[in-house]
Amino acid sequence: MWVFGYGSLIWKVDFPYQDKLVGYISGYSRRFWQGSTDHRGVPGKGSVWGVAYKLPVGKEEEVKAYLDFREKGGYRTTTVIFYPKDSTTEPFSVLLYIGTRDNPNYLGPAPLEDIAEQIFNAAGPSGKNTEYLFELANSMRSLVPEDADEHLFSLEKLVKERLEGKQNFNCIKRPN
């Protein structure tokens, strides 16, 4: 069994796997439309780059149960075709965790500035949403430097601007 990661499963791999491949799935777009600290893709045009992990033989159900718990909060699974970056490897089926529009955490489309503000202010048991965004952006630059994920990198820029603005605000002193 192979599982496709396109958010924290790329940079926070806390489960056993036998093999991994960089590649993409088609017909989806990466968006920050989930009202939790998680980042999930939504069906649509385009493609989403990420990493497919082959779960260890004999441990598939155990690892899947862990991932089901980790990816809770309005997600369902579906099977999609994965296209490895290495074109000598044939495409194959992977399991995809995806946020659904009918879950209570789904926020839907919003202006990038609003999403950036949400990310800037959001924190939960798994940490700050800014960490999630920056780890994902750095991972994508490293894994697939040729992919210009406009949504992801625009959000990263807007959130960094907010952080810089906060630091500058904290450095302002009153004149004596």
Curated annotation (Swiss-Prot):
The keyword Kinase does not apply. Keywords: Cytoplasm, Lyase. GO terms for molecular function: glutathione specific gamma-glutamylcyclotransferase activity. It is found in: Cytoplasm, Cytosol. Signal peptide: none annotated. The active site is at E71. GO terms for biological process: glutathione catabolic process. It catalyses: glutathione = L-cysteinylglycine + 5-oxo-L-proline. Its EC number is 4.3.2.7. It is an enzyme of class 4 (lyase). One of its GO terms (cellular component) is cytoplasm. Gene3D superfamilies: Gamma-glutamyl cyclotransferase-like. The keyword Iron does not apply. It holds the Pfam family ChaC. Substrate binds at V3, F4, G5, Y6, G7, S8. Catalyzes the cleavage of glutathione into 5-oxo-L-proline and a Cys-Gly dipeptide. Acts specifically on glutathione, but not on other gamma-glutamyl peptides. Belongs to the gamma-glutamylcyclotransferase family. ChaC subfamily. This is Putative glutathione-specific gamma-glutamylcyclotransferase 2. The gene is CHAC2.
